[in-house]
């Protein structure tokens, strides 16, 4: 059986890690042990924050909706309750976008929610 020298495979593996560690600072970009650890940790952060991103955006939409309905004499929770009672099915992302880009349309939805609460 022929002897297998593993230099080519090792070099390819290291190259892959270095490519992922591109842009890192200090030894984390050019020492294989540090680069591997940094790339692993970066992967953990990426996985965790893909989940967290959904929560963060929902919180942002809620804050924007709340800021838009307060001048209309309502709070966020009262507004959402009014929407549910009036049968308006619009998600928070769309409501937030409407509040920013189409204030008149958002105000019409808010009036509908207010009317449903009064009834």
UniProtKB/Swiss-Prot annotation:
GO (cellular component) term, any one: ribonucleoprotein complex
InterPro entries: Ribosomal_bL20, RIBOSOMAL_L20_CS, Ribosomal_protein_bL20_C
GO annotation terms (biological process): ribosomal large subunit assembly; translation
A matching Pfam family: Ribosomal_L20
SUPFAM superfamilies per the UniProt record, alphabetical: Ribosomal protein L20 (SSF74731)
Keyword Ligase in record: no
GO molecular function: rRNA binding; structural constituent of ribosome
Top-level taxon: Bacteria
The entry's keywords: Ribonucleoprotein, Ribosomal protein, RNA-binding, rRNA-binding
Family: Belongs to the bacterial ribosomal protein bL20 family.
HAMAP family: Ribosomal_bL20
Role summary: Binds directly to 23S ribosomal RNA and is necessary for the in vitro assembly process of the 50S ribosomal subunit. It is not involved in the protein synthesizing functions of that subunit.
Name under which the protein is recorded: Large ribosomal subunit protein bL20
Biological source species: Rhodopseudomonas palustris (strain BisB5)
């Amino acid at each position: 059986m022929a002897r297998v020298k593993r230099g080519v495979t090792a070099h390819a593996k290291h190259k892959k890690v270095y490519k992922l560690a591109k842009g890192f600072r200090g030894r984390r970009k050019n020492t294989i042990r540090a680069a591997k650890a940094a790339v692993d940790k970066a992967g953990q952060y990426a996985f965790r924050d893909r989940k967290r991103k959904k929560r963060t955006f929902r919180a942002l939409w809620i804050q924007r909706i709340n800021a838009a309905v307060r001048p209309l004499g309502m709070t966020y929770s009262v507004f959402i309750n009014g929407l549910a009672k009036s049968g308006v099915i619009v998600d928070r992302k769309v409501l937030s976008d409407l509040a920013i880009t189409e204030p008149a349309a958002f105000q019409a939805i808010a009036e509908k929610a207010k009317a449903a609460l009064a009834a």
